[in-house]
């Protein structure tokens, strides 16, 4: 009885009672988990207990078996499997007995069954479960509650378990699901549970979809369910069609004309949002699939082979029916629409964009009449829909087909930036931003640039949602203007460009925008800073005085922000404070890159002092530390060797960054900075190397360090060796052993992420070897004898390159690094290398591949390495 009372108190409004109950349950779970779970399952299984007690008991069981965190979940599953088999059997019997006895929804028992199943089925236990669940659904005497909760359990199992574990059970599971979905099934609750279960099982029913008769049957049942009067069932059935379209596109031709087309078009027209959303989602998915197929077709054509799968061009064929529904849906916007609410109006905009990318030129004639008819409509909803439709078709069609249309529309768009409706202004600003990004020639043409800039500058004072889009338009405009400017042959940046005359005003307005009191709304503050960064980055020489001014403003703001720290009251203040520091650091990086060397020297003391203060005050915030480290990197780039005077003061913070592997982005930034310091300070980095090397080696040996940090560390060894030359000898043995170990790493080749990682790791090993050989060899005509210390490893290094050559997954980057290293080995060790390379014909194939590469680096280095090998051959 005591347990029941305590379970009932887990929903008590009295905080003390609630906490006491939770403490008791936590203690019981720790003291004797098996007994606790058996007791809980008894409470759950007894229909005489209160609903509150049963639900709470189910929740306790479920939470002891599963977790959102995959690592904890795996631990819980192991812990369950370690429990005595009799106790487990008892719990399993009770939770199965509970199915069908609960009068409330959703069923607790179904979640418990699934939790246990996901632990036991992968280790081939509880073989009787699936047959028992199937029997529950197919037995004509089963109650509605029994069928519903059992189908829920099946759905949860399908959702959470690795599909391979259920492959051999897919027929039985499908039988139960289809039984529950049939139109003869009287209960909509059962139908819903079955339709949801089908949605979760689609990944592992491939064998059933491959057989025509079974596929017909599944498709028939799903299509019938889309006509169910119960909205919940209808939505779930449509969700199935959306997913089936992605998984089984190749099989859909039979069903498209007779059924799917009509069902989804009807759904798109529905007044019920959830139904309309699924109809639109279906066609968005068709576009996604057909774009992938178009890419596959062009790759196949390049390689002179037929594609594996071909597109049926459903989207193109349906344009004339889809576009009118989508443009009509665009007029259903909600005036106080919150950005986070997904609704048919937003989905229609996305679907139009996808159709535009997928069908290219073909979409324009279908959308243009709607735009022309409504862009000046007195009803704001239609004006907005017309602008939205216009903005949505800018990517996909041939730019030359769109350009005249856009230039023609420019005066209207400039006018709409002053529209009485904030929604229309917002959409117009977004559309102008897309024009600047995708068709910049239309935006920076002589006729409209001045009025466009005028309306954008005014737009920065509009509501946050409008101003935020204007900031983005400025970013794209600056980039386009910079790329269109004339650059003298010997110069890196243009002397002047089309934004020069308004540059100072734009920068001033953006700085004002970053200071707006409502800057936290719609991401306005960060959009304005990002826009400022783009504009400074893309500025011509005659804008330099304004860049100097901006630099001083940013530095002043950084100092002000650091003084605010003592006034922080709340967590939200702290978040805004950290965000502002990060934005200022990022902006600082951009202005520093533009600043001339002598100016940089004048401000560097103040900049460095601010950054050091920031490191001191934000030891707890990884995000700010990362941004501050990146800002130091930029300062190092700009100052070069002059940075040496700050090293003593900065060294402790570099150490803290290198040790902060818990926030691995910070650690990565610190490792990257070590490389920058080596390039800038050259041999002057020597006094700091012992400490840095020790931290780097500790990180490599620590398995809690995120794997993405390790390749970067290996590559930095090469930078250090290049910087300090012969002084690297004292680290040589340990570094070469580390590289030998890292270059033998193996990964699971079926996991694409791990294949990428392996390439990254190999590229870093090759870069490290290159730095070491070049550093020890010296840059004089005569090779320094220190390099002979690497001689014993040369054969291993070439075997490593040979191994890479034989791995078909190697990237261009790896080929380039390998070729560069071969060339360096030739110049350092001469004819010995030739013999070792001759014995490994795959290396020659790798160099041939490099010489034919589309990337410049691989081509240049492979050609050079081949020449070096040829030189040795001629000498021999």
From Swiss-Prot:
UniProt entry tagged with the keyword Hydrolase: no
GO biological process, one term: mitotic metaphase chromosome alignment
List of residues that carry N6-acetyllysine: 211, 835, 867
Xref: InterPro entries: ARM-like (IPR011989), ARM-type_fold (IPR016024), Armadillo (IPR000225), HEAT_type_2 (IPR021133), Importin-beta_N (IPR001494), Importin_beta (IPR040122)
Keywords for this protein: Acetylation, ADP-ribosylation, Cytoplasm, Nucleus, Phosphoprotein, Protein transport, Repeat, Transport
Protein's UniProt keywords contain Oxidoreductase: no
Region of interest: Essential for high affinity interaction with RPL23A: 286-462
Modified residues (N-acetylmethionine): 1
Entry's localization field: Cytoplasm; Nucleus envelope
GO cellular component: cytoplasmic stress granule; cytosol; endoplasmic reticulum tubular network; NLS-dependent protein nuclear import complex; nuclear membrane; nucleoplasm; protein-containing complex
Protein name in UniProt: Importin subunit beta-1
Encoding gene, per UniProt annotation: Kpnb1
């Amino acid at each position: 009885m005591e347990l029941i009372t305590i379970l009932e108190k887990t929903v008590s409004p009295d905080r003390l009672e609630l906490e006491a109950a939770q403490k008791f349950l936590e203690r019981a779970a720790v003291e004797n988990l098996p007994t606790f779970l058996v007791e809980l399952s008894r409470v759950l299984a007894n229909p005489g207990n209160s609903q509150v007690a049963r639900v709470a008991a189910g929740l306790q069981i479920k939470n002891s078996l599963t977790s959102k965190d995959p690592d904890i979940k795996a631990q819980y599953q192991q812990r369950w499997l370690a429990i005595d088999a009799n106790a487990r059997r008892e719990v399993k019997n009770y939770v199965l007995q509970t199915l069908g006895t609960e009068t409330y929804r959703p069923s607790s028992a179904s979640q418990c069954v699934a939790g246990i199943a996901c632990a036991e089925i992968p280790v081939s236990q509880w073989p009787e479960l699936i047959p028992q669940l199937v029997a529950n659904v197919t037995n004509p005497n089963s109650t509605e509650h029994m069928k519903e909760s059992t189908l829920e359990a099946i759905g949860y199992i399908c959702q959470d378990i690795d599909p391979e574990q259920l492959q051999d059970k897919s027929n039985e599971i499908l039988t139960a699901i289809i039984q529950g979905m049939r139109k003869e099934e009287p209960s909509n609750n059962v139908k819903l549970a079955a339709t949801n279960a089908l949605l979760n099982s689609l990944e592992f029913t491939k064998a059933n979809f491959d057989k025509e008769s079974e596929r017909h049957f599944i498709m028939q049942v799903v299509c019938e369910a889309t006509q169910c009067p119960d909205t919940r069932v209808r939505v779930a059935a449509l969700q199935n069609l959306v997913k089936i379209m992605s998984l089984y596109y190749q099989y859909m031709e039979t069903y498209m004309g007779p059924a799917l087309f009509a069902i989804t078009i009807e759904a798109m027209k529905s007044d019920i949002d959830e139904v309309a959303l699924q109809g639109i989602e279906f066609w968005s998915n068709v576009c996604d699939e057909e774009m992938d197929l178009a890419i596959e077709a062009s790759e196949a054509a390049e390689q002179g082979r037929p594609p594996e799968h071909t597109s049926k061009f459903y989207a193109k064929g349906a344009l004339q029916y889809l576009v009118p529904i989508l443009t009509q849906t665009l007029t259903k916007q909600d005036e106080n629409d919150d950005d986070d609410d997904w609704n048919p109006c937003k989905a229609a905009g996305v679907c139009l964009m996808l159709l535009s990318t997928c069908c290219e030129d073909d979409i324009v004639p279908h959308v243009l009449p709607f735009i022309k008819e409504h862009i000046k409509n007195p009803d704001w909803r239609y004006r907005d829909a017309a602008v939205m439709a216009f903005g949505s078709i800018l990517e996909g069609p041939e730019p030359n087909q769109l350009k005249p249309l856009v230039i023609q529309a420019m005066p209207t768009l400039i006018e709409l930036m002053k529209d009485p409706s904030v929604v229309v202004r917002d959409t117009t600003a977004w559309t102008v931003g897309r024009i600047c990004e995708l068709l910049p020639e239309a935006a920076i043409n002589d006729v409209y640039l001045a009025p466009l800039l005028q309306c954008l500058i005014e737009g920065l004072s509009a509501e946050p949602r409008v101003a935020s889009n204007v900031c983005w338009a400025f970013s794209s405009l600056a980039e386009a203007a910079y790329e269109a400017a004339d650059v003298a042959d010997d110069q890196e940046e243009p002397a002047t460009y089309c934004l020069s005359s308004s540059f100072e005003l734009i920068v001033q307005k953006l700085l004002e925008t970053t200071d707006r009191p409502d800057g936290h709304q719609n991401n306005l503050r960060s959009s304005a800073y990002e826009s400022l960064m783009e504009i400074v980055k893309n500025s011509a020489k005659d804008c330099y005085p304004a860049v100097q001014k901006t630099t001083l403003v940013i530095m002043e703001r950084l100092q002000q922000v650091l003084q605010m720290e003592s006034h922080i009251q709340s967590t939200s203040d702290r978040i805004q404070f950290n965000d502002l520091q990060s934005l200022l650091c990022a902006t600082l990086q951009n202005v520093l890159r533009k600043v001339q060397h002598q100016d940089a020297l004048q401000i560097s003391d103040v900049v460095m002092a601010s950054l050091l203060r920031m490191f001191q005050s934000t030891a707890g915030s990884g995000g700010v530390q990362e941004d501050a480290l990146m800002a130091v990197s930029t300062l190092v780039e700009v100052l070069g060797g002059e940075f040496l005077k700050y090293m003593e003061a900065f060294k402790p913070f570099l150490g803290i960054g290198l040790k902060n592997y818990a926030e691995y982005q910070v650690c990565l930034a610190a490792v990257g900075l070590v490389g920058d310091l080596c390039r800038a300070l050259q041999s002057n980095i020597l006094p700091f190397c012992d400490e840095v090397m020790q931290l780097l080696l500790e990180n490599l040996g620590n398995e809690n360090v995120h794997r993405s940090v390790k390749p970067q560390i290996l590559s930095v060894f090469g930078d250090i060796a290049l910087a300090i030359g012969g002084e690297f000898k004292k680290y040589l043995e340990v570094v070469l052993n580390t590289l030998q170990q890292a270059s033998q790493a193996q990964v699971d080749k079926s996991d694409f992420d791990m294949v990428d990682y392996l390439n990254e790791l190999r590229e870093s090993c090759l870069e490290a070897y290159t730095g070491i050989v070049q550093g020890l060899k010296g840059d004089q005509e005569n090779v320094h004898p220190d390099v002979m210390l690497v001689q014993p490893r040369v054969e291993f290094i070439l075997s490593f390159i040979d191994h890479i050559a034989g791995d078909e997954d190697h990237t261009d980057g790896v080929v380039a690094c390998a070729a560069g290293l071969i060339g360096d080995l030739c110049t350092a060790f001469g004819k010995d290398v030739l013999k070792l390379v001759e014995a490994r014909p795959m290396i020659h194939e790798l160099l041939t591949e490099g010489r034919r590469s589309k990337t410049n680096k691989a081509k240049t280095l492979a050609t050079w390495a081949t020449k070096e090998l040829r030189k040795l051959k001629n000498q021999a």
